[in-house]
Amino acid sequence: MVKLVFARHGESEWNKANLFTGWADVDLSEKGTQQAIDAGKLIKEAGIEFDQAYTSVLKRAIKTTNLALEASDQLWVPVEKSWRLNERHYGGLTGKNKAEAAEQFGDEQVHIWRRSYDVLPPNMDRDDEHSAHTDRRYASLDDSVIPDAENLKVTLERALPFWEDKIAPALKDGKNVFVGAHGNSIRALVKHIKQLSDDEIMDVEIPNFPPLVFEFDEKLNVVKEYYLGK
């Protein structure tokens, strides 16, 4: 059976500060760095050997991927980066403290923005310091593709082509795959893999640690799902 390991990035500096992060390129905290290393140690203990790795274009996921591969003695494994694995874009909430946002907009509204499947948060201004429209890493993309805000539905729509074009074919070829990504891009793919309803995915949380493992048969039916070390 082939294995797919999802590792959400370790705690970031903005996770630590309770800020909405989204596409802002925030670094790992000291705790997050250790979580990434510990993820790699769990992978090594489990004897999982990868053939291919994928990650986003955000440093917290890239570093988590590299640290986990290094700690599992697999730093040589090819890594492909894609914006399609980025975190959900939190729009105008980016950089805001979650508690302060609740005070400003109300607990219920912020909860809807965070947890609903298809409600968009406010758009980010194009001149915002965190706007992806002026970020060089997205220069090859058509400007119309770059989001100003996303919900989980939109996140799945842009992550799904990467699943279909890259991850699923690798698994079908018998390759074990590592994906170092983000809470919501992983949630989106888990929704697709498990065929969860829009309501069911609302209750799914992806922790910074430990990694989540799916084992598939040759037709990519899920045979087993578990968290490493649990």
UniProtKB/Swiss-Prot annotation:
- Write out the residues that bind substrate: 8-15, 21-22, 60, 87-90, 98, 114-115, 183-184
Alphabetic keyword roster = Gluconeogenesis, Glycolysis, Isomerase
Active site residues according to the UniProt entry: 9, 87
Reaction it catalyzes: (2R)-2-phosphoglycerate = (2R)-3-phosphoglycerate
> Where on the tree of life does the source sit, at the highest rank?
Bacteria
Supply the Gene3D superfamilies for this chain. Phosphoglycerate mutase-like
**A biological process from GO:** gluconeogenesis
Enzyme Commission number(s) of this protein: 5.4.2.11
Record flagged with keyword Cytoplasm: no
Recorded metabolic or biological pathway in which this protein acts? Carbohydrate degradation; glycolysis; pyruvate from D-glyceraldehyde 3-phosphate: step 3/5
Q: Where is this site: Transition state stabilizer?
A: 182
MF terms from GO for this chain are: phosphoglycerate mutase activity
The top EC class is isomerase
Cite the HAMAP family for this sequence.
PGAM_GpmA
Family per similarity comment: Belongs to the phosphoglycerate mutase family. BPG-dependent PGAM subfamily.
Q: What does this protein do?
A: Catalyzes the interconversion of 2-phosphoglycerate and 3-phosphoglycerate.
UniProt-recorded name of the protein: 2,3-bisphosphoglycerate-dependent phosphoglycerate mutase
**Organism, per UniProt?**
Streptococcus sanguinis (strain SK36)
Q: Which gene encodes it?
A: gpmA
